[in-house]
Amino acid sequence: MTKEQLLHQIANIGYSTSYGRDKCYSTADIATKTTWRITILGVFVALLCVLYPILNNISVLAFGVIGLTILGIYLRPYTDNKYIESAQKLERIERQLQNLYFEVKANNETEPRLNVYGQKLEDLDDQQKTASISSQVLGSDWYTHVKLFWAKKINSQWFVDELKLKFFF
């Protein structure tokens, strides 16, 4: 494997790790914030029903409350701390990958040293695969892309430049 190929591979795994980290954070954000919004909306609707008894007779209101309850039930499993813990592990691995990337980029040695870097990369890739969670909440992909390419550009610039990534195509 050449130095350029190794750098590209490190950046590729760095992207996957960063994406997995942001996806876990996105799932936790969506589940936590949406659950709170449902709770606040439920309290607001209950207060309206108390203040305006005519609303108690409207079946649309009942279907709305049922829909919000189903959404709350769907989001409940995603409020677990395992998503935050996984994101924190992936964040540490991403930092190690970033350090490895810059170490390889600065190194002008020959082939034997690249094998050591390749082994470090394999170890970090295995750690990343172990730390990631495959089950994520609906909408976390979109939110992850916004975080990765829009909100946190500085943190991801090293692999974005190497892989020539863009927000749209």
Model feature map: region roles:
Residues L41-V50, V65-T69:
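Hydrophobic, membrane-inserted alpha-helices
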Residues A46-V65, G72-R76:
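Hydrophobic alpha-helical transmembrane segments
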